[in-house]
Amino acid sequence: MDRLRLPTLPRRTFIEVMVGGLLAAPRAADAQQPRVYRVGVVLQGGPYLGAVDGLRKGLAELGLEEGKQVVLHVRDGKGDLKAVEQAAGDLEREKVDLIYSVATSVTLAVKQATKKVPIVFNTGNDPVTFGLVQSFRKPGGRLTGTFSRSTDLIGKRLELLKEMVPRLRRVVTFYNPDTPSSELRMKVARDAARQLKVELLARRVASVEELRAGLRALRTGEADAYCSTADATVISQTALIIDTARAKKLPTMFIEQESVTQGGLASYGVSYSAIGRLSARYVQQILLGAHPGDLPVEQIDRFYFVINLKTAKALGLTIPQSLLQRADEVIACPEKADASRGC
């Protein structure tokens, strides 16, 4: 009986088929890999880094885990707006999917340095006033995010500081006159100080180096306390401010609760960790196809009053019980101390 003979391929054709199959296999595997999104983060360091931690947590809760579904490219300007602009331009050229910016001056710099990349921001000043969006409800353009009213709360911080430091007569603050929001912030601060009958010692510092020099030059007893006015250049050096205040026995009032956990006396304002967590929703929606201009800006109305009793004790301050009861968080005294008496 004749054997059944199967058709055979010419040798050259056989090799081409085999090689083609081997090359196609990796392509098929690649096609099944989920997309990894790339998110640039631009800020000025210091307490602002809390927003990065919050962003990571928020994205993970939304199913975007860092290192798996998303990669964060964090750029710290360390108080230098030129470094911020450079970082933003570099990130766009590296084709990140989105940039997350923290602080008004940083967001303005990021917008200026980029052309197409979507931007999710947190600002302490009205984003409409500063031309970042057209309106809260319909931002338009490629920017959206959150607004935390840090400038509006300067008066409240001074008021709380005066309650904690009854002898308060002179308050020192530092600000960078080159930041776009400096004029507005200092007007709010001066008006509030005038109403509280407190002298505001406003020191101009155009760079981190000038701030460091200004802190070194501050004489013990020259001021009765320090109050932050939401300047990003200054906030980037919060650790140095806290160290200087400790050495000069100077009570401090900050914006963000992260500064109090580092040793500041008190804060009234935002939690950057909470802001980052909230911002993750915007980031997720844009990565999945939403247009920034269609996502309404959210105004943050949750503020935290935090007191560090350990710092109060070191300063020899007794915090009134009425203030302790109003605080959202009190960092406790050492064991066996009477917290109700301010340690």
Per-range role (PLM):
Residues 1-343:
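Short hydrophobic alpha-helices and adjacent helix-cap/hinge residues
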